[in-house]
């Protein structure tokens, strides 16, 4: 199961890397950032194919998207100087709590 979660973490990493490139692509007019974005998304989905066999798809997707949202919000704050209101910060922590709760019951759902 550890290997499965490593694949899931890798998928989150590649999805976040691709999403962080979105502003750099300038509406997909810049070839190299656009190609890198596509490559990162392909890697993310490739890794997810190994995860979906071990974790129910709803839990896999909730974890992938939840951790991606949390990470992108933090990186957007750091690299793009985007502000986060206290409500957004609270919401992000609730997402993390939800991901932890959902994954703590993964074995019982399989």
Positions of predicted regions on the chain:
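Polytopic alpha-helical membrane proteins, predominantly small-molecule transporters/carriers
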Residues: 1-110
């Amino acid at each position: 199961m550890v290997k499965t979660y490593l694949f899931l973490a890798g998928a989150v990493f590649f999805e976040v890397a691709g999403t962080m490139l979105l502003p750099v692509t300038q509406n997909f007019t810049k070839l190299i950032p656009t190609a890198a974005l596509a490559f990162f998304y392909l890697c993310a989905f490739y890794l997810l194919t190994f995860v979906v066999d071990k974790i129910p798809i709803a839990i896999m997707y909730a974890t992938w998207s939840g951790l991606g949202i949390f990470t992108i919000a933090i990186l957007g704050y750091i690299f793009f100087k985007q502000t986060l209101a206290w409500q957004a910060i609270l919401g992000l922590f609730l997402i993390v709590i939800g991901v932890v709760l959902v994954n703590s019951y993964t074995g019982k759902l399989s």
